[in-house]
Curated annotation (Swiss-Prot):
The gene is engB. Mg(2+) binds at residues 42, 64. It comes from Haemophilus influenzae (strain PittEE). Gene3D superfamilies: P-loop containing nucleotide triphosphate hydrolases. This is Probable GTP-binding protein EngB. Residues 27-201 form the EngB-type G domain. Disulfide bonds: none annotated. GO terms for cellular component: cytosol. Coiled coil: none annotated. Belongs to the TRAFAC class TrmE-Era-EngA-EngB-Septin-like GTPase superfamily. EngB GTPase family. It comes from the Bacteria.
């Protein structure tokens, strides 16, 4: 597989979709970003691309209800999935969304990898584990980013990373776990390197 290095600073907004069935055709390579409503997903995308307002951040958890697609280069897309697990969303909507999310992860042919973001202080909640299960069952590689790592001391951070790495072993999937902080620039290089690796099959053809 040929090694590539994409310039994520050139990433731009492509389109928004109200649901999984409305996203553009299944071509190129997509990498999806998922996480609980307060996991810092938009902040991570902005840090990766070095753009303050590429993905809109909100003080109100659950604000991102649309699926937002961003283009790194033609045929290379990042997909920002709506935050899950927000209490104020009606139960029926939650159930419907979780069902379509599972479908997307398991049936989308151009999906090359999944980045799951979790607050380092509260990792592996039920829905996080559900996302991991779906991805593993679809043979999809996963990068778990433990966000807000700057909130912990270095030793506490290392302990949490070790704990999560051990906790995910039973899933038996291709799962990498890294600490991440947009504020302190922790893990941004590892995120970019993983995306490069996942995007590379198209370059190798």
């Amino acid at each position: 597989m040929s090694e590539i290095k994409l310039n994520y600073h050139k990433t731009h907004f492509l389109t928004s979709a109200p649901n999984i069935r409305s996203i553009p055709e299944d071509t190129g390579i997509e990498i999806a970003f998922a996480g609980r409503s307060n996991a810092g997903k938009s902040t991570a995308l902005n840090a990766l691309t070095n753009q303050k307002n590429l993905a809109r951040t909100s003080k109100t958890p659950g604000r991102t209800q649309l699926i937002n697609l961003f283009e790194v280069e033609p045929n290379y897309k990042l997909v920002d999935l709506p935050g899950y697990g927000y209490a104020a969303v009606p139960e029926q909507m939650k159930i419907q969304w979780q069902k379509s999310l599972g479908e997307y992860l398991q049936k989308r042919e151009c999906l090359s990898g999944l980045v799951v973001l979790m607050d380092i202080r509260h990792p592996l909640k039920d829905l996080d584990q559900q996302m991991i299960e779906w991805a593993v069952s679809a043979d999809l590689p996963i990068l778990l980013l433990l966000t807000k790592a700057d909130k912990l001391s270095q030793s506490a951070r290392s302990k949490q990373v070790k704990m999560v790495r051990e906790a995910i072993l039973p899933f038996q999937g291709d799962i990498q776990v890294e600490a991440f902080s947009a504020q302190n620039k922790i893990g941004i290089d590892k995120l970019a390197a993983k995306l490069d690796f996942w995007f590379s099959p198209l370059f190798a053809k």
